């Protein structure tokens, strides 16, 4: 019960920041139709190796969603047909399933986890970039509000097949599996996977000024471009009547991983030190002698008074 209360408080902080940047909350199904995913070639186990797949009684093959770019893009075809319908920003909190080879460290890396995934649909790259920075700022607010902002760094990482770079938000902890290199004077960080002379030159960084940090990834933001809108035919008519594909972005935060990270970085020798914003309760009231009716009555009065004044 205590852990769930903290999870819910983290979720509410994330929800609040998503709503502030005009995100609309939705809920999508976890069961995935393979036909949609085949259009982007991500049903193929050679391309994506962490699917959980199953079959219905009629032998129809389904998958358990590890992300939702394909199904949401397909749905948005019914809601976006003109540039006047853009931009759109939608997000959800949902349990994801990933057949991870190395599921370990409790809620820091599991095969089943609660995730906030946000998706943006924009007219063009310029409009997308403006929102991308808004999400980045919202993420910084989230990490500050839950008490780990001072240890969390926006980090250049591989853009995969989507873009030159993506950005990860990496929190310093010995429990992490990632390595970043941080320029403490500028605050710029790069993931070990892109730690090359070419990237450092592009970011105007010097190797000798970088400090190695062990970290855990607590969030990420991706520019998707037309990676999904093109094969799934999410197309709009622009202001000149020309047809163009929608420019997309994807932004994730693992709620359970945030909770686990707080425990790792803020605990002391006596146990967990929850930041007030996510602590399961504001205070603990202990009645030391429940056999004494006067003491018990007074304790109940204090308890009722605290509740009336907004304490939990």
Feature locations, PLM:
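NTP/phosphate- and nucleic-acid-binding module
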Residues: 1-312
């Amino acid at each position: 019960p205590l852990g769930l209360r903290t999870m819910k408080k983290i979720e509410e902080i994330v929800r609040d920041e998503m709503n502030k940047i005009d995100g609309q909350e939705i809920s999508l199904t976890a069961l995935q139709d393979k036909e949609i995913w085949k259009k982007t070639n991500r049903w193929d186990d050679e391309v994506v190796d962490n699917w959980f797949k199953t079959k219905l009684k009629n032998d129809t093959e389904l998958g358990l969603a590890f992300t939702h770019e394909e199904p949401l893009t397909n749905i948005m075809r019914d809601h976006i047909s003109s540039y006047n319908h853009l931009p759109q920003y939608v997000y959800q909190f949902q349990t994801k399933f990933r057949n991870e080879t190395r599921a370990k460290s409790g809620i820091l890396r599991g095969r089943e986890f609660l995730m906030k995934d946000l998706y943006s649909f924009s007219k063009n790259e310029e409009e997308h970039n403006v929102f991308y920075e808004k999400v980045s700022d919202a993420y910084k607010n989230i990490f500050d509000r839950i008490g780990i902002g001072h240890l969390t760094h926006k980090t250049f990482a591989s853009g995969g097949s989507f873009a030159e770079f993506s950005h990860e938000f990496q929190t310093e902890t010995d429990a992490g599996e990632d390595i970043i290199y941080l320029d403490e004077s500028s605050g710029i960080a790069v993931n070990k996977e892109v730690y090359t002379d070419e990237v450092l030159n592009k970011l105007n960084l010097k190797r000798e000024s970088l400090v190695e940090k062990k970290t855990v990834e607590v969030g990420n933001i991706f520019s998707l471009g037309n990676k999904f809108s093109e094969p799934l035919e999410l197309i709009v008519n622009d202001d000149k009547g020309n047809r163009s594909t929608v420019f997309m972005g994807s932004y994730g935060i693992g709620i359970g991983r945030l909770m686990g990270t707080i425990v790792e970085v803020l605990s002391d020798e006596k146990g967990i030190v929850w930041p007030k914003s996510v602590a399961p309760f504001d205070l603990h009231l202990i009645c030391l002698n429940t056999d004494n009716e006067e003491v018990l009555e007074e304790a109940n009065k204090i308890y009722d008074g605290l509740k009336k004044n907004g304490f939990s």
